[in-house]
Amino acid sequence: MSEDINNNLNNSDNSNGSNEKIIVGLDEAGRGPVLGPMVIASVKIDEKNLYKLNDLELKDSKQLSKKKREELYIIINEMCDVEKIVIDPETIDKQMEIINLNKIELSAFSKLSNHFIRENDNISIYIDACSSSEQSFSNQFKAKLINKNVEIIAEHKADENYKIVSAASIIAKVTRDRVIEEYKETFGEIGSGYPSDPKTKKFLKNYVYENRTLPKIARKSWATSKNLLKEIEESKIFQWVK
């Protein structure tokens, strides 16, 4: 599952005819859930228009109500250039066979960033660092960029400290939430998709015990999924012994 970014990358004009300073914010939603996609979002705005974002009640998406996130999602899309990469569970599982989640995230972050750098390399990129070391994350991120001279501000809690990253956080969160709502139309109540959510745990356990397999919306590489499948196998052995 993916959104418009691939077409936009292929069809984008490599020059926007301007070298005015631009600001880009990057963040993700859905890194830890056992159900559903991980969404990587970027938000770009001309530096001269950054004050417009500062006038909004932007903060980390988790600190906002669903209604407020939806309202801001519309405003941000109207005000900024927004791009998203939606990585579905199957793709996450395949990539996790060869790389870890941090590298999956880094790859998506760099893909979005290079899209903007091709248009204008006079750019500052603000990004929520997804590893324990901000410097290590920044170095790995920069290594994937087509221009190593762009300014990178990679920090923990950047979604709380910089409005441009808060905006990306909101875009990512709302996009993922909408996918989860689509899932509910097919599967019924599934909760938030996080392993700690009682509704998610109940749905997943019931589904696995009824179908003897995981739903396609589950990340099979997650410990929660593996443990459930192990329970099924052990229950089969127990019934055979009886």
Curated annotation (Swiss-Prot):
One of its GO terms (molecular function) is manganese ion binding. Belongs to the RNase HII family. Its EC number is 3.1.26.4. The lineage of its organism: Archaea, Methanobacteriati, Methanobacteriota, Methanomada group, Methanococci. It comes from Methanococcus maripaludis (strain DSM 14266 / JCM 13030 / NBRC 101832 / S2 / LL). Its cofactor is Mn(2+); Mg(2+). It catalyses: Endonucleolytic cleavage to 5'-phosphomonoester. Keywords: Cytoplasm, Endonuclease, Hydrolase, Manganese, Metal-binding, Nuclease. This is Ribonuclease HII. GO terms for biological process: DNA replication, removal of RNA primer; mismatch repair. GO terms for cellular component: cytoplasm; ribonuclease H2 complex. A divalent metal cation binds at D27, E28, D128. PANTHER family: RIBONUCLEASE, RIBONUCLEASE H2 SUBUNIT A.
